[in-house]
């Protein structure tokens, strides 16, 4: 099974040392400075994201990348931040289920594969919030993401 058809979840995690070989920053608009690892995507995914964002721009819509590649270690840090702030115990040792269902356990996030990209738009201040779905960009993304390989 190759990376493009691999199931990544709590039952099928990526190993802690997994890093995609062909990560790249293709230069899409991003809410992160150049050199930030979250700008990275697997090369084919990066090209698809560029085409998606350019298609949105042709319709006067602005999509901004928020988070692409995320290492196992970075995912651990995010989980610790969403657990008991008074504890320095790694998240997966405190709780078998996320406190925040949108924060995956380390190894279970598709971001570690380099195939996932979170996007937002100016109408919601480039935040990752549910109100994005009601913006013109969010509605456009629902209709068009699959045309570029995103589900």
Question: Model-found features: residue ranges?
Answer:
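Extracytoplasmic cell-surface/polysaccharide-interacting catalytic and binding patches
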Residues: 1-68, 72-151
